[in-house]
């Protein structure tokens, strides 16, 4: 039998941290932010409360890390289809629609984000960290948008910042509407594509 690998201190801590994040995501999604305690997360991960606090400042920080990791993972899932779509704007928008329809059918992330924001809104430190996470998300959105826009549109286009802000804000609004059940994932995808097509046209005209 092969010898079991002995983890370094850093590897062991990274493993513990990931196990806590996985457990937190599972419980936050299943029970909601408010109903999930750190004790429950620690138990689900097979760890102690001390392990939680040695990796995260508290429940708010743990939740924000879950949101940040899942948001970036979902955004990264769009990169491959966009690249595979080639230079066709219609194909790129079709890739966006398919991606949005998939994530729109799973409202857990947007619901958790809403719970986190309302719970920490009056906490200046957590609000600052949430804003920092949002800025990083928008930076990643910029990378994807620069790949998705029609050929010939420069990355430093004067309307690019506006396009990113509107894309993120519109996406958040549509995602919330889907979570509330006022529109379905297919309709949400169609609205996202329509919005992006308008911006693509504006970028082309103004280049």
Specify the residue positions occupied by each region the protein language model found.
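Generic hydrophobic, amphipathic alpha-helix propensity
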Residues: 12-25, 41, 66-70, 74, ...
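Hydrophobic/aromatic-rich alpha-helical bundle segments in the mid-to-C-terminal region
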Residues: 127-131, 148-207
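Amphipathic, non-transmembrane alpha-helical scaffold segments
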Residues: 13, 21, 67, 127-138, ...
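N-terminal intrinsically disordered/low-complexity leader segments
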Residues: 1-15, 149, 204-207
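Secondary-structure edge/capping motif, primarily at the C-terminal ends of alpha-helices
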Residues: 81, 85, 120-121, 178-182
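Helix-turn-helix
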Residues: 19, 23-61, 65
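Hydrophobic alpha-helical connector segments
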Residues: 65, 79-110, 155, 160-167, ...
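Amphipathic alpha-helical segments used for helix-helix packing
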Residues: 91-92, 104-128, 176
